[in-house]
Every structure is written in structure tokens, then in C-alpha cells.
């Protein structure tokens, strides 16, 4: 049994909070992004990330675990068929919270929580930024290229030596044949 978080329950009992977060997660997976209060968005993020991680595994047990939270079968199907495979190469960080302007009626802090659709940062992007990670990767790449060039040079020189020897033998045979013809 998970221990409840300390502090306010987002304006209700623990069961109300649990159901409200389930509804927010359902809307997030259905629409891709939702606008809600900052507090709700911060409470929703760990739940959504956990559900996406279970969807990435994709087995029956995890599908049933997700069905405990999200009651809509269509949303669960979308989560396992589209969203989970989309994040297959990403280890966490599936959602993004962006602060928005306060709500007009009560001036509550608002935020937009959305699923991240961009791919992770590639090596080319790191190289363009000139980060330490990119420099380390560049040094490793240069070292492997140098080793590859050395191995190709040694194989080329070995092949060249083996092709030169028959050429010299062929010249010797040609001169011997010419001498026989002259005599």
C-alpha cells in the first residue's frame, strides 16, 4: 500500500484525488496535452510517466495494472499501441510541464502538461552545441577511425605485395619466352 503524500489532497479526500488524477491521465493520453493548475500538473506527471513505462513493456500484466487506473479501454489501447512504442527509445521524461498565464477568474497558477513528441537529442545536435559529451564522443570517433585506417593500410600493403610478386614472375617468363623465340 503506497503511503499517502503529505499535505493537501488537491481539495478533497485521498480517493477523490486518486480519481481526479486518473481522469487527468485519461485526458492527457487521449488529447496529448491538457491545461490544468500547476499543482495538479505536478501531481499528474509521476503517474503519467509510470503508466507510459508500463505501456512500453506491453504485456498483459502491465495492461491490467494500467486498467486499474485508466478505465477507458480505448485510451488504454491508444496508450499501448501508439504512445508506448513511440517512447520505446526514451528512458523517462515523457511529459513536459509549461507554465501558462494565471486563470482569469481566480488567478490560479495554470500549466500545460503535454506528451513529448520530439526525439531525444542526437549526437549531431550535441556536436553543434559543443558540449563536453560531444567532445568525448568526437575523440572516440576519431580514435576508431584512426584504427580503421591503420587496418585498411596494412591489408592494402599486404595485397600490394602479393600482387607485385606475380607481376615480376610474369615479366621474367615473358623475357624467357622472347629469348627462346630469338634463338
Swiss-Prot record:
Residues 130-183 are annotated as: Disordered. One of its GO terms (biological process) is translation. Residues 151-162 have a biased composition (Acidic residues). Keywords: Ribonucleoprotein, Ribosomal protein. Transmembrane segments: none annotated. One of its GO terms (cellular component) is cytosolic large ribosomal subunit. GO terms for molecular function: structural constituent of ribosome. The keyword Ligase does not apply. PROSITE patterns: RIBOSOMAL_L17. Belongs to the bacterial ribosomal protein bL17 family. Part of the 50S ribosomal subunit. Contacts protein L32. This is Large ribosomal subunit protein bL17. It comes from Saccharopolyspora erythraea (strain ATCC 11635 / DSM 40517 / JCM 4748 / NBRC 13426 / NCIMB 8594 / NRRL 2338).
Amino acid at each position: 500500500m503506497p503511503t499517502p503524500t503529505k499535505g493537501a489532497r488537491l481539495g478533497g479526500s485521498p480517493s477523490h484525488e486518486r480519481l481526479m488524477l486518473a481522469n487527468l491521465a485519461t485526458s492527457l493520453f487521449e488529447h496529448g496535452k491538457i491545461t490544468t493548475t500547476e499543482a495538479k500538473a505536478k501531481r499528474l506527471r509521476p503517474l503519467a510517466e509510470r503508466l507510459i513505462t508500463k505501456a512500453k513493456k506491453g504485456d498483459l500484466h502491465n495492461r491490467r495494472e494500467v486498467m486499474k487506473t485508466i478505465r477507458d479501454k480505448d485510451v488504454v489501447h491508444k496508450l499501448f499501441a501508439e504512445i508506448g512504442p513511440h517512447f520505446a527509445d526514451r528512458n523517462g521524461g515523457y511529459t513536459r510541464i509549461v507554465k501558462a498565464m494565471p486563470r482569469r477568474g481566480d488567478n490560479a497558477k495554470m500549466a500545460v502538461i503535454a506528451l513529448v513528441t520530439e526525439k531525444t537529442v542526437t549526437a549531431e545536435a550535441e556536436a553543434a552545441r559543443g558540449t563536453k559529451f560531444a567532445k568525448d564522443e568526437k575523440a572516440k570517433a576519431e580514435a576508431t577511425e584512426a584504427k580503421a585506417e591503420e587496418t585498411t593500410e596494412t591489408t592494402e600493403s599486404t595485397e600490394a605485395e602479393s600482387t607485385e610478386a606475380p607481376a615480376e614472375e610474369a615479366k621474367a617468363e615473358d623475357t624467357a619466352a622472347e629469348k627462346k623465340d630469338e634463338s
